[in-house]
């Protein structure tokens, strides 16, 4: 890091040195990205070493603290049916860069490194404000840089740390331990200060937020807080989040970004699904000797629906259909080969159907498949300067159907080896078949 300081001073002071780089040049952004990426790798190494040492000291298995996208939907399906209220919140952004520097100051004791961090923040601010039009510079500004992802994860960690601490202290149930995270010297300093000033204040806060049935789930910049408590308790948590972001991060957080809904009556949007809790009536006939009677029971069931309006809107922006959902040809792909066109359409169709395989209404998936299949046929017909009817008559409609349903047949065979149910029952079952490696770009996770 100290050797990089000479490069930064050379770039900023071009009159003293013969090494001058223009801020809009390719080399300038290349070196700026290399410095930031290297700085991010160094920070990740230091933070990961502290995390591993903390895990070894506390002897906590790492597997208990791993949470993936594959476990979110089964968790919601198992827990939401027994809870009452859900709080839908968006993590506020963007945060002022100087606040991040002050937060990292308790971790980084090297003063030149903090100055380097401020310089990198300043360069990113200038890069985002210029809106460059050159392709060489646009490549660096469009990439999801590792350093920015590290800062985002660290910011989210700071937001969730105090919440996890209060959640653990105010509950007698087993929860994710907050001690496995990185130690914070200034946080415990504040706790000691509060203990000296007022011994009962912290206990009052814990009693103020006490709830033994509360769950927190976050994916990217959106999170949900689900509880079995009352509406008053959810409003208390809302008040806590608003004041926390306002006084700790100096960020004015609008209260309307946290929406509290009652699960049996409303639905909420999370991870590309509209989720709600439905009442499922069940009638059971009970026979006791000569008397028989009926027992009516109500069970709660999590209902997840793929948002067809948002999916069609995404397909419309990608020029696969109109705003109303009418398929159109993809004109910019007509210069590709037939196999490449089919491969691109089928890959998009597979990703969408995989991600939304847990939808309770399969008609949405059938409509998306219809749009992509007909858009593919229109694109191929436009390339060969023919009509869709003539093109399909020449190749046969079974060709496209077999190509699109190849993934579904392979998926059915995989599950048939484990669960012996009929093929026609597969369409009615919800299978959370999520593929992180091939996550589609058309799903809006915000």
Curated annotation (Swiss-Prot):
Signal peptide: none annotated. Transmembrane segments: none annotated. Usually encoded in the trnK tRNA gene intron. Probably assists in splicing its own and other chloroplast group II introns. Keywords: Chloroplast, mRNA processing, Plastid, RNA-binding, tRNA processing. One of its GO terms (molecular function) is RNA binding. It comes from the Eukaryota. Pfam families: Intron_maturas2, MatK_N. One of its GO terms (cellular component) is chloroplast. This is Maturase K. GO terms for biological process: mRNA processing; RNA splicing; tRNA processing. It is found in: Plastid, Chloroplast. InterPro entries: Domain_X, Maturase_MatK, Maturase_MatK_N. PANTHER family: MATURASE K. The lineage of its organism: Eukaryota, Viridiplantae, Streptophyta, Embryophyta, Tracheophyta. Its main location: plastid. Belongs to the intron maturase 2 family. MatK subfamily. The keyword Cell inner membrane does not apply.
